[in-house]
Amino acid sequence: MINSKIIILNNNKVIYYKPQNITLISILEKNDIILDSQCKQGYCGSCRIKLLKGHVYYKNIFPLASCKPKDIFPCCCTISGSILIKI
């Protein structure tokens, strides 16, 4: 499988990963990027970040917290390609 990347705009960090069925927050945490998070199920919205480019998927849980356009919830979304985010 081809490696994809997560580019984090506000700290110029690039994370390379092999697409798997794991949440975005898990990938970030494995790379020492810790976000505020409480419920890890999309209810509270504390992990909300901006998706500037790319796509995320909500397979098992769709977030219930209110959000603005381009807001995503890394605790319950997965990715399958490269993305650009702002934390």
UniProtKB/Swiss-Prot annotation:
CDD domains referenced in this protein's UniProt entry, alphabetically: fer2 (cd00207)
Keyword Transport on entry: yes
Cofactor binding, note field: Binds 1 [2Fe-2S] cluster.
Coiled-coil residue windows: none
Molecular function per GO: 2 iron, 2 sulfur cluster binding; metal ion binding
Residues reported in the UniProt entry to bind [2Fe-2S] cluster: 39, 44, 47, 75
Source superkingdom: Bacteria
Keyword Zinc in record: no
UniProt keyword annotations, A-Z: 2Fe-2S, Electron transport, Iron, Iron-sulfur, Metal-binding, Transport
Cofactor(s) needed by this chain: [2Fe-2S] cluster
Residue intervals of the 2Fe-2S ferredoxin-type domain: 4-87
Name of the protein: Uncharacterized ferredoxin-like protein bbp_166
Organism field: Buchnera aphidicola subsp. Baizongia pistaciae (strain Bp)
